[in-house]
Structure formats: structure tokens, C-alpha cells
Amino acid sequence: MSNRERPVKPYDLTVSVTPRYVPEQSDPSQQQYVFAYTVRITNTGSHPAQVISRHWIITDGEERVQEVRGLGVVGQQPLLAPGETFEYTSGCPLPTPIGTMRGTYHCVGENGIPFEVPIAEFLLAMPRTLH
């Protein structure tokens, strides 16, 4: 079965993340490295779905883990119609020039049934940094 023939799920959100280093907000001499990341959430399902909350797992270059939980994304709980995309940019300060983020969006379908959308791990790295 090809991707085009794949059955459409009632509730299916696709997440893509584009991270970047923010040198103008970073101060390596103070062990402060700031990263921005732009997230695109697209409703690839056949019914409306709403992002209710988020859970991030942030790991720095020393393997220290921080978990962040909160309502919505950038102060919103976007309701996405089928085919609709919501995009936002946020930031993450780290004490190391490299790290990773991964997480989960907690969502609800129009029927009130909750579901989770995994956010694949992505790399936060200062340019020209070897791991």
C-alpha cells in the first residue's frame, strides 16, 4: 500500500521542528546558549483536533534532563481543521552548546477523546560544535 493509499485516521497530527542557534541571545563565556525552534503542526486527519498541552524532555550536553509541561503552545490551544497547519516559534536556553529536545502534545478530538502526538527528538547545536 503506498503512502497515498494509506487510510486517513480520524485524529492524526503531523509535527515538524526546525531548530536554530541564536548567537545574539547567547553568551558562551557564561555558559548560556540559546536556541529557537519553529514547530509546524498539521492536521492530516479527517476530523478537527485541538492541542491542549505539551510535555518536553530537554537534555543538555552533560546528559542533564529537564522536563517542561504546560497548557497549550505559546499561550494558545489551537483547534486545527483537517488540512490546517499551526506554526509557532519558541526558545530553549541551555548551559551547553549542544543538546536535544523531544516530547509529546496532548490533544483532544472533536468527540472529546484525548490522544497523544509524539514529537521526535531533534538536535540543538551551536554551529561548528562537535559532539
From Swiss-Prot:
Gene3D superfamilies: ApaG domain
Protein name: Protein ApaG
PANTHER family: OS05G0170800 PROTEIN (PTHR47191:SF2)
Record-linked Pfam families: DUF525
The ApaG domain, residue ranges: 7-131
